[in-house]
Amino acid sequence: MGDVVLAGIVAVAGCVQWLTGMGFALVAAPALMLLLGPVDGVLLANCSAGIVSCAGLVSGWRGVRPRAMVPFVAAAVCTVPVGAWTASRLPEPVLMVVLGALVCLAVGLVVHGLRMPGLAGTGGALVAGGAGGFMNAAAGVGGPPMSLYGVNAGWSMREFVPNAQFYGVVVNVVSVAAGRLPRLTGRSWVVVGGALFVGAVVGWALAGRVPERGVRGLVLGLALVGGGLTVGKGLWGL
């Protein structure tokens, strides 16, 4: 039963990622934390999101903007160890509350799309990248700061997606390296790989047929519910 639920979470998140270019971690991380615990849930979200981003980058690497992304990912790499250290030092119930709250905060940032002119330049890339690295290592949701940076830089979705995928590859690889691989059985790893493939196929088939706005709303709704449940589970265990 556990592997069936795991497959469903990863497949849905993978499908969403292929439909919108982002959203894997927002959908998967809260659910995986509830299923596997905060540490292994975040680590698996990082592993899977890195694989999905790498697959997407294969066809979109020409759209990466090095001038913007080098300071962004450099800042993220510097703060990933801080996020991993923080997560490793907290008791599990407290960690669940903190991670759930970070997920809810991430949803709020995406929904409001804060306009801050200072986030458009190199300084903004450093600030957003630093926040993203910490949030990715601690809670598996490093995408919202990237979204805010893209909004304030005036990027279109076509410009945003390859840069977000590049960031996703780097920050997730570093996040896993700063921690460890999630403790899964060989069978569960096969399930995850198969679910990622199924999610990609379904997402590719539905691309252009499903309204992006509706998918985005579903992503944020699922993430908010998952974050709230994670907070509730943590509070229950205190």
What are these language model-derived features?
Residues L109-G132:
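Alpha-helical multi-pass membrane helix bundles of inner-membrane/thylakoid proteins
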Residues V39-H112:
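Membrane helix-loop-helix hairpins that form the core translocation module of multi-pass transporters
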Residues D3-V70, A128-G129, G133-N136, V141-A200:
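Small-residue-rich hydrophobic segments that form or flank transmembrane alpha-helices
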Residues V201-V225:
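Interfacial loop-to-transmembrane junctions
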Residues G37, P91, S156, P211-V215:
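A helix-boundary/kink motif common to multi-pass secondary transporters
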Residues L229-L238:
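Juxtamembrane boundary at the C-terminal end of a transmembrane helix
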Residues A7, N46, L99-V103, V107, ...:
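Residues within membrane-spanning alpha-helices of integral membrane proteins
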Residues P30, G83-S88, L148, W204, ...:
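Small-residue-mediated transmembrane helix hinge/kink sites in multi-pass secondary transporters
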